[in-house]
């Protein structure tokens, strides 16, 4: 008798669920995926497509996207062999974890943090060690260092600025953790362009156990293009490259990246707008009774309300999509929403005043 299909699958799947965006991805006002509210201008898209038309479509791209990697290495000021480009930072995350984790390994994850870290680790049969954030959702660097030593972990992942809390770990604290740890340290800087803290990319020459993860989906407004990067000491990067899927990045992605980097003022202007709106929104939210605001170092804001899921559903009915993050540890009754255009932000504020406002 043949075995049940479930017996033939990775046993880790039994405790995992497929990734899902609650509420979907379509709405009149969409603020649930931390995207940029600004698309690329038409003239820049036309430049990209004109260049792409000249590329051979019947031939595979390079095994690795060397053009894109050289361009990004020059942009961030590191050697080209210190950079790896991927089909989105999530694909890079899978590659790094494949290179570094597996049975018998231990990973330390502060919680709450990006859910994909734990998911990939479980798939690779890696033991997960959690370190809770402090009550105000700030990182506990001392606890991370202490727990990493006690548990003899092999890998530490730090999302800073952190999704879903919106808070950062000071760059000096990141370095202190990397210096103290007998482990590889991955620093996910998906939201670094919005942060008050410095990037730690410059530290890879000094800290040989440091890996920095970057995405082009947030500040660079290229979520639809799927472009991510890892940056590390070249010797470490050579090992990370071994499980990398070949031919995973298209020529179109490389060309788009190069054109956006050549017109980076568009990114700078967009980030400036988002930061200004973040401050304005934060000020307005503080005046709404029944809403508790958390400090943000990202392009999104976290609020705590009395009944988060009911509010999430009511906003959805009113064609406004936000994210219910109540399922994360320490985040009961919390909602997350990214900064949109001013009129989108005003529409959200109006609904929050109608639905939440209570006497202070």
Swiss-Prot record:
Keyword Transferase: yes
Pathway: Amino-acid biosynthesis; L-histidine biosynthesis; L-histidine from 5-phospho-alpha-D-ribose 1-diphosphate: step 7/9
Gene (name only): hisC
Catalytic activity: L-histidinol phosphate + 2-oxoglutarate = 3-(imidazol-4-yl)-2-oxopropyl phosphate + L-glutamate
Organism domain of life: Bacteria
GO molecular function: histidinol-phosphate transaminase activity; pyridoxal phosphate binding
Family, per entry: Belongs to the class-II pyridoxal-phosphate-dependent aminotransferase family. Histidinol-phosphate aminotransferase subfamily.
Cofactor(s) recorded in Swiss-Prot or TrEMBL: pyridoxal 5'-phosphate
Pfam families hit by this protein: Aminotran_1_2
Keyword terms: Amino-acid biosynthesis, Aminotransferase, Histidine biosynthesis, Pyridoxal phosphate, Transferase
GO biological process: L-histidine biosynthetic process
Assembly and oligomerization: Homodimer.
Naturally occurring in which organism (per UniProt): Chlorobium phaeobacteroides (strain DSM 266 / SMG 266 / 2430)
Enzyme Commission no: 2.6.1.9
N6-(pyridoxal phosphate)lysine sites (modified residues): 218
Protein name: Histidinol-phosphate aminotransferase
């Amino acid at each position: 008798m043949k075995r049940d299909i479930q017996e033939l699958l990775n046993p880790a799947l039994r405790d995992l669920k497929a990734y899902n965006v609650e509420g979907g991805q379509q709405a009149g006002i969409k603020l649930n995926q931390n995207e940029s509210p600004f698309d690329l201008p038409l003239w820049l898209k036309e430049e990209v497509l004109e260049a792409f038309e000249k590329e051979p479509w019947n031939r595979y791209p390079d095994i690795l996207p060397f053009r894109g990697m050289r361009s990004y290495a020059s942009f961030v000021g590191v050697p080209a062999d210190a950079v790896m480009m991927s089909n989105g930072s999530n694909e890079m995350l899978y590659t790094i974890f494949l290179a570094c984790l597996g049975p018998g390994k231990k990973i330390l994850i502060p919680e709450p943090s990006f859910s994909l870290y734990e998911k990939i680790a479980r798939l690779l049969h890696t033991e997960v060690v959690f370190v809770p954030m402090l009550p105000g959702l700030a990182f506990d660097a001392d606890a991370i260092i202490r727990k990493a030593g006690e548990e003899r972990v092999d890998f530490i992942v730090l999302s800073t600025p952190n999704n879903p809390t919106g808070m950062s770990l000071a760059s000096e604290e990141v370095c202190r953790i990397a210096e103290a740890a007998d482990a590889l340290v991955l620093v996910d800087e998906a939201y670094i362009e919005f942060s008050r803290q410095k990037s730690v990319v410059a530290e890879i020459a000094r800290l040989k156990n440091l890996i920095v993860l970057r995405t082009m989906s947030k500040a660079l407004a290229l979520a639809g293009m799927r472009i991510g990067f890892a940056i590390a000491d070249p010797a470490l990067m050579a090992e990370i490259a071994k499980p990398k899927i070949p031919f995973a990045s298209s020529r179109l992605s490389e060309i788009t990246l190069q054109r956006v980097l050549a017109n980076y003022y568009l990114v700078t202007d967009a980030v400036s707008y988002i930061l200004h709106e973040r401050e304005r929104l934060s000020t307005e939210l503080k005046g709404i009774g029944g809403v508790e605001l958390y400090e943000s170092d990202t392009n999104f804001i976290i609020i705590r309300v009395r009944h988060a899921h009911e509010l999430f559903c009511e906003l959805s009915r009113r064609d406004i999509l936000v994210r219910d993050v109540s399922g994360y540890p320490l985040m009961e009754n919390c909602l997350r929403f990214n900064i949109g255009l001013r009129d989108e932000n005003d529409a959200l504020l109006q609904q929050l005043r109608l639905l939440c406002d209570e006497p202070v």
